[in-house]
């Protein structure tokens, strides 16, 4: 999780070059949101995470 968060600090949400456009996959964006929520002392229901819910969006 920390690695994904560190990747978001690179600020490469979109890359441009020579007529090409590349977007970073959404999981990195959502990992950033998740880590920030944990930093705000959110209480995380582990059962919801087991089922794949992304309730921190």
UniProtKB/Swiss-Prot annotation:
One Gene Ontology MF term: nucleic acid binding
Xref: InterPro entries: Piwi, RNaseH-like_sf, RNaseH_sf
Keywords from the UniProt entry: Toxin-antitoxin system
Pfam families: Piwi (PF02171)
Described function: Possibly the antitoxin component of a type II toxin-antitoxin (TA) system. Its cognate toxin is VapC4 (Potential).
Name of this protein: Putative antitoxin VapB4
Native source organism of the sequence: Methanocaldococcus jannaschii (strain ATCC 43067 / DSM 2661 / JAL-1 / JCM 10045 / NBRC 100440)
């Amino acid at each position: 999780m920390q690695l994904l968060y560190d990747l978001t600090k690179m600020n490469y949400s979109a890359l441009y070059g020579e007529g090409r456009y590349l977007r970073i996959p959404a999981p990195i964006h959502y990992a950033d949101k998740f880590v920030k929520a944990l930093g705000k002392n959110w209480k995380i229901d582990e059962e919801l995470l087991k089922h794949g819910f992304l309730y921190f969006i």
